[in-house]
Amino acid sequence: MTVMRGLLNGGRYGNRYIWTAISLRHPEVMEGNGLESAVMQWRRMLSNAGGAEAQVKEQKEEKKDAMVSNYWGISRPKITREDGSEWPWNCFMPWETYRSDLSIDLKKHHVPRTFMDKFAYRTVKILRVPTDIFFQRRYGCRAMMLETVAAVPGMVGGMLLHLKSLRKLEQSGGWIKALLEEAENERMHLMTMVELVQPKWYERLLVLAVQGVFFNSFFVLYVLSPKLAHRIVGYLEEEAIHSYTEYLKDIDSGAIKNIPAPAIAIDYWRLPKDATLKDVITVVRADEAHHRDVNHFASDVQVQGKELRDAPAPVGYH
């Protein structure tokens, strides 16, 4: 009766009182009263479940991260820099970093002689006009838009060569990897520029529009004429070199402040810890010169009636 009164009173006496009352009973009485035992077990289960849920919630709030299942055995190994400090990036690993070849010739130019070359050259010059009008000398925003476009051709070319390799059951000569490396490198340029520029909402909207139009246009172009597509990209890279050279002139003149380099750029290009914006733009420009050479070379190979797999791919630069 003491136990029943405790339950009816809504636990007014608390669990301690109830358990004390039960402990005073004769063992035979406890064994014979299955209802009381069931009620107590039920209350204990509710209490334990609530505590476990609270603990999990607490852990989630402390970590401020989604709970990840260990069932699949996927985990990030501990990765460190050369100095032993923890590697902070998930988007690229230490073995994917490199030092740009700053000795590359920035003045190389493919002189347009054939109709295809002239068409590619004029197309790029026409595309530059609205860019000059919209961005003028805001080279940070200009570079962001440029890298949004420049990261597309490598991905499109690599994807189509990948499908061709599967379809024809033949090797690509390393060109799939080379073009995808180019696309990833251009994407890292963009990620760096976003750290520097912090684009406004209308610039982000412009990026969406440009990417949608350019990706589909370049996809169709590459299907119809890969050699023309690579020639256009070669001339686009020449324009990129010019834009970054003007960017550096404004930094040298003081028109643009030579701020410290973003951490992501220091790690990706293996720059010194005291690197500045000028150092970042210098290595990015060197990358663009390399992409210029690769795409003009790819176009030359196909102009000669050969396939890309017949020529060695420049794999491993980045």
From Swiss-Prot:
Q: How is the cofactor bound?
A: Binds 2 iron ions per subunit.
Q: Which GO terms describe its biological process?
A: alternative respiration
Q: Where in the cell is it found?
A: Mitochondrion inner membrane
The keyword Ribonucleoprotein belongs to this UniProt entry's keyword annotation: no
Cellular component (GO) terms are: mitochondrial inner membrane
In the bilayer, the protein is annotated as: Multi-pass membrane protein
- Classification via InterPro entries: AOX (IPR002680), AOX_sf (IPR038659)
List the molecular function annotations (GO) for this entry. alternative oxidase activity; metal ion binding; superoxide-generating NADPH oxidase activity; ubiquinol:oxygen oxidoreductase activity
Iron: present as a keyword of the record?
yes
Identify which cofactors the protein needs according to its UniProt entry. Answer: Fe cation
Q: Which reaction does it catalyse?
A: 2 a ubiquinol + O2 = 2 a ubiquinone + 2 H2O
**Residues annotated to bind Fe cation 2:** E186, E237, E288, H291
Write down the superkingdom of origin.
Eukaryota
EC id: 1.10.3.11
Per the entry, what induces it? Increases during ripening.
TM regions (residue ranges): 143-163, 205-225
Assigned keywords, A-Z: Disulfide bond, Electron transport, Iron, Membrane, Metal-binding, Mitochondrion, Mitochondrion inner membrane, Oxidoreductase, Respiratory chain, Transit peptide, Transmembrane, Transmembrane helix, Transport
Q: Which family does it belong to?
A: Belongs to the alternative oxidase family.
The record describes the protein's role as: Catalyzes the cyanide-resistant oxidation of ubiquinol and the reduction of molecular oxygen to water, but does not translocate protons and consequently is not linked to oxidative phosphorylation. May increase respiration when the cytochrome respiratory pathway is restricted, or in response to low temperatures.
Describe its partners and assembly state: Homodimer; disulfide-linked.
Report what the protein is called.
Ubiquinol oxidase, mitochondrial
Q: What organism, scientifically named, is this protein from?
A: Mangifera indica (Mango)
